[in-house]
Amino acid sequence: MTKGPISNFIETHYKHFNAAALVDAAKGYEAHLTEGGKMMITLAGAMSTAELGKSLAEMIRQGKVDIISCTGANLEEDIMNLVAHSHYKRVPNYRDLSPQDEWDLLENHYNRVTDTCIPEEEAFRRLQKHIYKIWKDAEDNGERYFPHEFMYKILLSGELQQYYEIDPKNSWMLAAAERNLPMVVPGWEDSTMGNIFASYVIKGELKASTMKSGIEYMTWLAKWYPENSGGKGVGFFQIGGGIAGDFPICVVPMLYQDMEMTDIPFWSYFCQISDSTTSYGSYSGAVPNEKITWGKLDIHTPKFIVESDATIVAPLMFAWILGW
């Protein structure tokens, strides 16, 4: 592949320290795919609100990612950006906000993520109106689905097209839905849509069982992993920390130790982008070698860690992999 201007800039200038780690990790990702490997990307933090879809969607379309694990927030916030982008409010001076300023944002139905405020009415409620119908229809038909499957349904139905406010090619969730990309969403309950779903259960309008659970995500992943880990194996590209990464990486030791599948391959590539510093008792800040003791990575697994802001690093790495 002929590399474009962004890749050439990275190759020329990123020679040392975290910059060099970025290049090494990107080249490792590229080599893993070239040798026939598959890749899981995990999304923590507010990557969807950071509009990672501008590069991640193309990664999905070009087959550079085979499965995604993400938080419930990332699952919904990409779609919220798709349907309410013009209503978002940026607050560059967020460090100077007083408690009263924050209260004023709440009174105006804005929920702040660092310098970006998500508009409650246009984002959350607009989506709620349509997703409830899909939840209810499934329940009435005796059907049960995973959280991401419901989101795929609403995107592919075309019902949200009337609200699109960005170029749909920049929505990674739309790209994933169009490819029916495998996905796990651990801890989905900890999200706006999860809270809304719970409210309908409390009101007696929906049954909790209509939504497939986290345990069912793990049992599904326990089937997917052995079917896809032959040859070069499956790599693990972790953006941020938290449950989006901690949950799926455990499928390997679970299969090995609890299912006694002693020939199950370890993850065959590992990279984490995180600004969580190595500290006492922190899983997100742990160095990759610690994962060897948990039966997640092999001694010989290529391991990379880029200790930097993922909103800066991930698009650059994706640009390299895409040849931009």
What does each model-identified segment do?
Residues A25-M39, A175-R179, K223-G233:
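Glycine-rich phosphate/diphosphate-binding loops that line cofactor/substrate pockets in enzymes
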Residues D101-T192:
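Ligand-binding beta-strand-loop-alpha-helix segment within the catalytic cores
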